Amino acid sequence: MAQAPARYDEFAEWYERWIGDAPPLIAAHSGLLPAVTGERVLDIACGQGRMSRYLARLGADVAGVDISAAMLGKARAVGPEDITYIHADVTRHPAWWDGRPFGGCTCELALMDIDDLAGTLSTVTTVLRPGGWFVASIVHPCFPGSERGRSSWPSGEGYEYEGWWTSPDHNPEGVRIRVGATHRKLSTVLNALHDAGLEAERFVEPPAPVPTYLLWRCRRR
């Protein structure tokens, strides 16, 4: 498969201004994280390092990986220096990996930015030790027809549509009009986790009139 596109490179400056260091899902993630003090943790699609820094503050030994050199530049500029940032495509075999297993992996609101889900999850199971955990979040896949989500869906399409999309009508100040997203049905996501050798332990839908996000914790079998 061709290398994944680094869609955020063009928008790194804008994205940093737009989201800053706001932690919209940090609290929800924290409820799923096991104890991380002293644990090697890989933050997948780490962007400007928001989750990586949170994990480091909890005492984890953190590495962050991202395809966007521009976003990694933002992460390195903030620090701290004891976080290792890696410029790599997570959908490919992790040639950058030194072979020492990670105890956990995180991926905050990024799997819908990555075209090759199976390749990404293969990286997760490759670098995790047996029993290692994977905590991740995505935009909730189940509500494209809701009032909240309708304007962000491709014209004439619905839940069964799977693929990459952008919408010129959805939140002109937001991220999806710029970088788009890959929609997958809930069954596609759950089956991909299972097929990768990741056993689901817990799912969370943060409270909202219409669930906006889906989070989970899995373990490598």
What are these regions (language model features)?
Residues 1-37, 50-54, 71-74, 92, 133-168, ...:
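Conserved class I S-adenosyl-L-methionine
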Residues 42-44, 48-93:
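Class I SAM-dependent methyltransferase SAM/SAH-binding core
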Residues 179-203:
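Short alpha-helix
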Residues 95-105:
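A short acidic, Gly/Pro-enriched loop at the edge of an enzyme's catalytic core
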Residues 196-198, 209-221:
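Core SAM-dependent methyltransferase catalytic element
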Residues 118-133:
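A short glycine-rich, Lys/Arg-flanked "PGG" loop and its adjoining helix->strand segment in the class I
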Residues 103-117:
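A short SAM/SAH-binding and catalytic strip from SAM-dependent methyltransferases
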